């Protein structure tokens, strides 16, 4: 249900571990795993809450544009005679999804820190010149590993892709919960964050449930889309 709520799950655009289909398509796999990778990458550098510098935003913005253009090109394949000039592939979908995922993570964790913590630091995770290029290298290695479809890499990636949906949605809803309950910048410890985190987690599952039910009502099936 985790993938069903956020992804079309078209078989031709998904990875398989033997007969086990990934819960997310190639593009969504890249997006959610990229977001999780970026959050974990930043998590070891303190409670920094300043957004990335302009040059990083420019690169991240180009990823979003590429994501949109490649997505449009993939959609046009369903219309005979329409194309933007290149053949869509799961590799392109995975790369563009990962690029957007890096952007989501690069914005979401600073937003979480500056909203949650009373001792957040007004510095960027990417203030050192090598921090962002290193993240790009890690993202590239992730893409190469997933696209290789080697069992030792693909199976953990499939499992983590589902987990990443919960992590990203819960983080976003926790930020919203902090704002709505007027608890921004009041916490010093994770123990003090237990209620906002619980609210965020529950809201994430409510969103997943409602979105899944809406999709079922519209399609009449729990199966992946068959276009």
Protein language model features and the residues they cover:
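Secretory/periplasmic and organellar redox-cofactor proteins
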Residues: 1-14, 20-21, 29-38, 42-227
């Amino acid at each position: 249900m985790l993938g069903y709520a956020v992804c079309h799950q078209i078989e031709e655009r998904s990875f398989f571990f033997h007969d086990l289909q990934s819960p997310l398509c190639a593009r969504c796999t890249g997006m959610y795993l990229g977001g999780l990778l970026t959050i974990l990458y930043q998590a070891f550098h303190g409670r920094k809450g300043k957004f990335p510098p302009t040059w990083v935003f420019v690169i991240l913005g180009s990823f979003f544009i590429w994501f949109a253009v490649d997505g449009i090109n993939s959609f046009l394949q369903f219309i005979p005679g329409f194309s933007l000039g290149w053949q869509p592939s799961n590799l392109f979908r995975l790369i563009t999804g990962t690029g957007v995922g890096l952007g989501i993570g690069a914005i979401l964790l600073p937003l979480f820190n500056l909203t949650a913590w009373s001792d957040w630091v007004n510095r960027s995770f990417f203030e050192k010149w090598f921090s962002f290029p290193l993240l790009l290298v890690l993202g590239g290695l992730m893409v190469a590993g997933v696209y290789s479809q080697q069992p030792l890499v693909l199976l953990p990636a499939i499992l983590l892709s589902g987990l990443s949906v919960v992590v990203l949605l819960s983080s976003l809803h926790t930020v919203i919960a902090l704002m709505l309950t007027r608890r921004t910048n009041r916490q010093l410890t994770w123990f003090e964050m237990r209620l906002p985190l619980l609210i965020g987690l529950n809201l994430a599952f409510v969103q997943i449930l409602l979105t899944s039910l809406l999709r079922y009502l519209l399609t009449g099936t729990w199966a992946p889309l068959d276009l």
